[in-house]
Structures are given as structure tokens and as C-alpha cells.
Amino acid sequence: MKFLFDLFPVILFFAVFKWGEGNADAAQAFGQQFLSGLVSGGQVTVTQAPILLATAIAIIATILQIGYLLSRRKKVDGTLWLSLAIIVFFGGATIYFHNETFIKWKPTVLYWCFAAALLFSQIFLNKNLIRTMMEKQMSLPDGVWRRVNLSWVAFFITMGLLNLYVAFNFSTAAWVNFKLFGGMGLMFAFIIIQSLLLSKYLKEPQ
């Protein structure tokens, strides 16, 4: 359930964009009605409507995520606050300037923030964030923990670069598909490969 909860804004972004693509006139009318006051010039065109509506929904969904957790008196992870700040800034710029370039940078900025946090904590704070999250499930030598942490740094940097490559070398529709299925698929593959490599260190249930 937590996995689906975390993916909620991404899934809605994908669904609204696809709906907008298939219902261009309705999407343009809807965007003009609800977003015209937020865009520079006050006009939402047929070609712009799908990405602008999807971006607006992603911002709202992320705010609702945090609101739900706060209403249930649950802890809001720092990563979710970071995601909110980035989606509001880059998504807001996309809507105001009706320019999809900003929202296409959002995943890369988020990936690179994760990489920077992992690397900074290990080098300057002598704290391994991956170890903090995973040490209850497995016991690894210090050197292995460092390599696992650095492997995540490399993964996030690579994902950020890959996002930019797809975003600016393929159509927006292709990028939206990659954002959900490509990003999720590569994340799953990385986790599975890493889990297989580290399986010998898994703690036996008591």
C-alpha cells in the first residue's frame, strides 16, 4: 500500500496526461476554465492542455498526500517534503510559463537531491543513510555498507541523466511513459539485483 501511496501523484500525472491526449478539445476547455488565471497570457492551447493539467493534478496530489498524513498524525518523510517543494517550484513554472521544460527537469532534480544527500551524509557526516534504513533487515560489513550507499548514489545520478536524455530527445508522450514505467521498472530491477547480491547477509527470523 505504501508503494502505491508514494506513486499516487505519478500515476495521476500519467492518467491525466493520457486523458488529455485522447480528449484534446475537452482538455483544452477544462484547462482554460481552471488554469487560465495561472498561466502567463491567460490562454491554454490544445497542445499545452494535457501536460499543464497533468502537472496541476500532480501538485494537488502531492499536497493531498502530505495533508492526509498530517491529518492522521503520521510522520511525513523528508523525501516527501522535498518532492513537494520541487513539484511546486518546477510544476508552478511549467503552468505559469506554459513550458513543459520545467516539469521535465523535476525528476532529475529529485534524483540528484537524493544522490547528494546520500553522498554528503557519508563523506561529511560519517552517516550512511542506506544503512540506517536497511540495517534491521541485514547485517553487512562496514565496507559493504559503503559500497551499497555509493551504488545508490550512482543509480540516482544515472537516472537523472537518463531522464534528461529521454525528456529532450523523445516526444513528451514518450517521456510521460518513461516517467512511470521506465523509472519504476529500472528501480525494481536495481533493487532486485542488489537484493540478490546481498541475500547472503539477510538476517534469519528469530
Swiss-Prot record:
Signal sequence bounds: none
UniProt entry tagged with the keyword Cell inner membrane: yes
PANTHER family, A to Z: INNER MEMBRANE-SPANNING PROTEIN YCIB (PTHR36917:SF1), INTRACELLULAR SEPTATION PROTEIN A-RELATED (PTHR36917)
Organism: Herminiimonas arsenicoxydans
NCBIfam families on file: ispZ, PRK00259.1-3
Location in or out of the cell: Cell inner membrane
Top-level taxon of the source organism: Bacteria
Regions that span the bilayer: 50-70, 78-98, 105-125, 150-170, 173-193
Protein's recorded name: Inner membrane-spanning protein YciB
Keyword field: Cell inner membrane, Cell membrane, Membrane, Transmembrane, Transmembrane helix
Membrane topology: Multi-pass membrane protein
GO cellular component: plasma membrane
Similarity field: Belongs to the YciB family.
Protein task: Plays a role in cell envelope biogenesis, maintenance of cell envelope integrity and membrane homeostasis.
